[in-house]
Amino acid sequence: MEKKKSMFVEQSFPEHEIGDTNKNFDEDGRDKRTGTWMTGSAHIITAVIGSGVLSLAWAIAQLGWVAGPAVLMAFSFITYFTSTMLADCYRSPDPVTGKRNYTYMEVVRSYLGGRKVQLCGLAQYGNLIGITIGYTITASISMVAVKRSNCFHKNGHNVKCATSNTPFMIIFAIIQIILSQIPNFHNLSWLSILAAVMSFCYASIGVGLSIAKAAGGGEHVRTTLTGVTVGIDVSGAEKIWRTFQAIGDIAFAYAYSTVLIEIQDTLKAGPPSENKAMKRASLVGVSTTTFFYMLCGCVGYAAFGNDAPGNFLTGFGFYEPFWLIDFANVCIAVHLIGAYQVFCQPIFQFVESQSAKRWPDNKFITGEYKIHVPCCGDFSINFLRLVWRTSYVVVTAVVAMIFPFFNDFLGLIGAASFWPLTVYFPIEMHIAQKKIPKFSFTWTWLKILSWTCFIVSLVAAAGSVQGLIQSLKDFKPFQAP
């Protein structure tokens, strides 16, 4: 039998020496990178404007008109400031001509080394796993919201319309199993652009509905400078815990430092240099998301007041027009399908690259096979990729089914990852790269910023843990709420 008639054809790819540059390969021997600051911005917007935007009205309600926007702006500034430091560390020791570092861990190894590399890996991959679980929860909530919205429209708003999240988590997992066979970040640009468009759609719909609700008057909506009122809305202890949790939710809403290096590794070599292109992408991405966050958070709070739901599109702050709310929730689900891939690709590539280094001659791990699909063309299949990525998606879906707590889960992820990944490591690497003298003015204020963010992360984590404990008391897994 001729080899070309076989469904599977093993591929053999030539090795390319570092420095072998031509139109198909970069100086490190890898396929030529084609990303620009615009595709980088799309990746960032996909990563940042995620499920976090939906809880911002609730977060502003806990903090009030003064502290709410102030905390949003503070996290925005800190995230952009430290992302510029991280962008300069993609190459080492020189940010323009140095050796490429392909992952966050490699960057930390180049500049800091030692035990900090393991701590970075624990924080980064733990955070990425948590985010993919959180996105599974959120996507299923949005899918359920479509079904419940139609039920309310048909039967009235007083009907319970209880629907289990579990079947929709299974649907989401099946889609992710298929998309997870996309080999790497370099093939994700189209999905990120689609997801970014979806995020603009549902954020705009949420803002529009909030403006219409606030302008329409109706029932009295109570907002205050300090948020929910002790003795009326909550007890003193609840106010403290909710404030901490709201800070964690806002921190989560700016989570993209975990994938910044992987995004930067998709950008083509200059001019402009990768670090300049990444800084521009970060500026556009963070500015755009902050604008939408301010709109969604503040307009949502104006519409719902201190009774703002934890997720203002699925918590049924709105019932009509039901078709528009359905469309917004479909946009959320589509966006999170793409966002899930942005955050899980670094996990996939870490396991696969480590396996290939340890067992380079194992065909199960390193073999690539071409499969011809009628009407669709040829696809490359790797058995490790197929088994490992499928298993990962299934496990995250099962965990999401057991712990479907939206706000508390987001707050805990944000609190646990914000300080080490967004603040501590970028600042420490910047100090090492620029050789900033200890106890100098710059060194001192960078350390003050780092420790301040550490304290904020601690209190936010405490609030989220308390919220999870409260949610677990009456929860029964795999059942409709």
Curated annotation (Swiss-Prot):
Sequence similarity: Belongs to the amino acid/polyamine transporter 2 family. Amino acid/auxin permease (AAAP) (TC 2.A.18.2) subfamily.
Name of the featured protein: Amino acid permease 6
Lineage: Eukaryota, Viridiplantae, Streptophyta, Embryophyta, Tracheophyta
Compartment list: Cell membrane
Classification via PANTHER family: OS05G0424000 PROTEIN-RELATED (PTHR48017)
Major subcellular site: membrane
Keywords: Amino-acid transport, Cell membrane, Membrane, Symport, Transmembrane, Transmembrane helix, Transport
One of the protein's GO biological processes: tryptophan transport
Membrane-topology descriptor: Multi-pass membrane protein
Function: Amino acid-proton symporter. Stereospecific transporter with a broad specificity for tryptophan, proline, and neutral and acidic amino acids. Has an affinity for aspartate in a physiological range. Involved in the uptake of amino acids diffusing out of the xylem tracheids into the xylem parenchyma.
Keyword Glycosyltransferase found: no
Tissue expression notes: Expressed in roots and leaves, and at lower levels in stems and flowers. Found in the xylem parenchyma.
Transmembrane portions of the chain: 37-57, 58-78, 126-146, 168-188, 191-211, 243-263, 284-304, 322-342, 386-405, 409-427, 448-468
GO cellular component, one term: plasma membrane
Entry superkingdom: Eukaryota
Side of membrane Cytoplasmic, spans: 1-36, 79-125, 189-190, 264-283, 343-385, 428-447
Result of knocking out the encoding gene: Larger seeds and rosette leaves and increased number of cauline leaves at flowering. Decreased concentration of lysine, phenylalanine, leucine and aspartic acid in the sieve element sap, but no significant effect on aphid feeding behavior or reproduction.
Gene that this sequence comes from: AAP6
Keyword Transport: yes
